[in-house]
Amino acid sequence: QAIDSLSALGVVFVASAGNNGDANFHLLYDASVSDTLKTQVKFDSYSYPQMFGQCLTLWGTPGNSFEACIQVLNSSGTLLSETPFYLTDTLDTYINDTLFAGADTVLYNVLADSANAMNQRPFMQIRVASRNTANKIILQIHADTGIVHAWNLIELNNGVGNWGSDFAAPYAGYTAGDPYYGI
């Protein structure tokens, strides 16, 4: 009953079957506090045969669009490659693409919705695969107004697996994740 009543108010629930009590897999970005959030996406090991990479799930405030992009930095923090910013209000196709960072490739796909039919919240999902552990994958989020929640979850290619991995702050001005907003 509690979940039904909160859902009716537009609350989004993200459930995980994994043990996320010590994983800083969530971020809260408040556009009134910061222009653009930057964070490092930490990856689980690729020791699972079904491992694709990470799934970044982002939910915003109803009526407030947001945009996000990913970057590839080398171990020194130098930008190697990046996607454009994708905006929830204008992305109307599924993006399936590759970033080239020297001899490495980073696979990614993006889908978005300006207003989910169930809760009117803007939504974006970015799936990213990067096997070069020396490189850093960076998520950037920007909005003019509102709040955006983000979760960093494992993505397996068999459709299951949703335990969390950390968001990290490797440099000044970056934001680390927290263990909140998981059930």
Identify the function of each model-found stretch.
Residues 1-183:
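Loop-rich non-cytosolic ectodomains and luminal regions
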